[in-house]
Amino acid sequence: MSEQVKRVRVTQVGSPIGRKPGQKETLIGLGLHRMNASRELAATPETLGRIRKVKHLLKVEELS
């Protein structure tokens, strides 16, 4: 029996210019390289931690 992994869509809505270097690196780690870029990611604890670190720069939507 396989459990279906929850997914989230993250969209970059804020610029990393003038932010701490770690925040820019976190955006790159999430696969976001420019404004309004979106990615669908698995909602693992690691991914959710990264999202929490830069939540002020992202729009997050839960997918079914």
UniProtKB/Swiss-Prot annotation:
GO molecular function: structural constituent of ribosome
Keyword set, alphabetical order: Ribonucleoprotein, Ribosomal protein
GO biological process: translation
GO CC, one annotated term: cytosolic large ribosomal subunit
Pfam family, one: Ribosomal_L30
Residue ranges of the region described as Disordered: 1-22
CDD domains (UniProt xref): Ribosomal_L30 (cd01658)
Record Gene3D superfamilies: Ribosomal protein L30, ferredoxin-like fold domain
InterPro entries: Ribo_uL30_ferredoxin-like_sf, Ribosomal_uL30_bac-type, Ribosomal_uL30_ferredoxin-like
Presence of the UniProt keyword Ribonucleoprotein in the record: yes
Xref: NCBIfam families: rpmD_bact
Family classification: Belongs to the universal ribosomal protein uL30 family.
Quaternary structure annotation from Swiss-Prot or TrEMBL: Part of the 50S ribosomal subunit.
Protein known as: Large ribosomal subunit protein uL30
Lineage per the UniProt record: Bacteria, Pseudomonadati, Pseudomonadota, Alphaproteobacteria, Acetobacterales
